[in-house]
Design a protein with these regions (language model features):
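Acidic, glycine/proline-rich low-complexity segments that act as flexible tails and inter-domain linkers
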Residues: 1-107, 119-121, 125
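A structural signal for small-residue-enriched, beta-sheet-centric alpha/beta enzyme cores
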Residues: 9, 191-244
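Active-site-proximal beta-alpha loop/turn segments in soluble metabolic enzymes
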Residues: 61-65, 100, 141, 205-213
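Residue-level signal for inorganic ion chemistry
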Residues: 60, 145, 201
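Short coil/turn connectors at secondary-structure junctions
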Residues: 90-95, 120-124, 128, 140, ...
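Glycine- and other small-residue-rich loops at beta-strand/loop junctions that grip anionic moieties
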Residues: 33, 103-104, 129-130, 153, ...
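A generic, well-ordered mixed alpha/beta core segment in the N-terminal half of proteins
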Residues: 92-162
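Phosphate/diphosphate-binding glycine-rich loops and adjacent basic-rich segments that engage nucleotide
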Residues: 155-217
Length: 244
């Protein structure tokens, strides 16, 4: 009787690379170590590109949540969003609001009205958001603007930039402008918890140039990590608001 020779190629390269990052964030409290900025960026890119397996991605997201992301890890992931997402510009200083992508369920969000007041006064406003996503499935920025008669979803980056130039208002909509990130949404539903990506979404702005970044937080440790991460990312004008 003969036996087939075992495969020699082994697991795909991306999965092997990802194992090293998973070991770092998934070990016990005495052996777990943080990723460098570059490693965190690479880990996120492997997830966005589907180079890591679904099991690896789920394990990484929940382990990272339990351990809590370190500032340089958030900065590394922010580097990826900055590179892959749209880059909007204005001829004058702008303001960008970092809002929860999974929306609101218990409070009435006023930031669409705030954005309209600011833009009508000539201050460019850049917002980022997505469709309804786990775990809250709250009302989203694009839905709120639609209620006011502004259809901001389903638009090209060129259209968004043109309206920012003309009206001082822009909404970057993840399904349209950062579709790679949409591939990670089902994991939120399966895990039942918000992964560190939710913290990343509060720190990201698509605006390039001088701006004030307003970011919300709930827990004080989250605020401290956000400040350090944004400082590493070169953000010099930041305002954090509890519960925003």
């Amino acid at each position: 009787m003969t036996y087939a020779a075992p495969p020699t190629d082994g697991p795909p390269k991306g999965r092997e690379l990802f194992k090293a990052y998973l070991r770092k964030v998934g070990s016990g409290e005495h052996t777990s170590s943080g990723l460098t900025r570059e490693e965190a960026a690479h880990a996120l890119e492997l997830m966005l590109d589907g180079a890591a397996s679904p099991a690896q991605i789920g394990a990484f997201l929940i382990a990272h949540r339990i351990r809590r992301p370190e500032p340089q890890e958030l900065t590394g992931m922010l580097d990826v969003y900055r590179k892959r997402g749209p880059q909007l510009t204005t001829g004058k200083p702008a303001i960008s609001f970092g809002m929860p992508f999974d929306g609101r369920t218990r409070t009435a969000p006023i930031y669409p009205l705030t954005a309209l007041v600011l833009s009508s006064a000539g201050l460019p406003v850049v917002l980022q958001g997505a469709g309804r996503i786990p775990v809250k499935y709250g009302i989203t920025a694009q839905e709120l603007f639609a209620c006011l008669g502004l259809q901001l979803a389903g638009r090209s980056v060129e259209w968004v930039q043109a309206k920012l130039n003309a009206c001082d208002l822009a909404l970057v909509h993840q399904p349209d402008h950062l579709p790679d990130a949409e591939t990670l949404i089902p994991y939120r539903e399966d895990l039942g918890k918000r992964p560190p990506l939710a913290s990343l979404e509060l720190l990201w702005t698509a605006h390039q140039g001088e701006h004030l970044l307003v970011s919300g937080f709930v827990h004080p440790p989250t605020e401290a990590r956000a400040w350090k991460a944004l400082d590493l990312a070169g953000e010099t004008n930041v305002l954090t608001v509890k519960g925003l």
